[in-house]
Amino acid sequence: MAAPTDIRASRDAGYWSQFAATWTTLLTYRYLGRVNPVLDQGVERVTMPLRHDMRDSEGRVMAAPLAIAAAESGGMHDDLYIPNPVTASLDILDDALGVTRVRVLPDTIRLGRTMGFSRSLIVDDDDPARVIALSSGTAISLGSPPPGYRPVDNPPLEVADSPDMPRLHQVFNICPLAGGEWQLPALGTGTASPDAALHLGPQHIALETAAGARMRREFGAAAPRIRHWQVMFVARGKVGPFVTRSELIDGQGGGVAVRVALLDSGNEQRVISSATAIY
């Protein structure tokens, strides 16, 4: 498999053709079914289906899919920026039982020359008055693309929804390790963003997989649901494999938290992201 190529090295004539190739190869949005009118042809609003693989064993919506649906980028999009996420925060208000599709209502708080601040409401697409979660985040721009952008023809993959469908961590080949941690394979074209770094999608999924597994080891089937999810993207994941490192913090007041770091084992164990999950 060819190694991902950093789009910033492309010359003007080939920039957008490389972007289209990267966008249509990236697995995150195609598999989860998330579409965006700025980036995808023929799309009117940001939506994503909610399937069985996006819920826990009790049918409650998970944090990673919602964070991917919102994909906070500080109000930046690839048409005018080369966005790189810095933080993502999510508060879940509703388990989304019975919801088949969510809609994201984005709001740019402030967009500067190189940094942006954004927030979103994630609602039931059939009943927008039903708020599922609140999302917010920040991002920086790694540069400015050349003119000539056009939305990409990138329809979602056809994924049949069923109770026995593969879990998201299985689709992204995130595997358990001895000691309770998890490993995401080396960077590939299916997991790389246009700047040839590990995309936010696999990071959210790997981090929440590790957090949820830590909770189940502690509480079994009685593990409470996730309420708050926060991720800091602290460095670009360039090599891999990527390995989690987690710790559970049991508060005396009844709350439980799990902190998870994702390390690039092929790049001197560099921490590339850090998550906090509150249950």
Positions of the model-derived regions?
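Terminal targeting signals and extreme-terminal segments of soluble enzymes
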Residues: 1-279
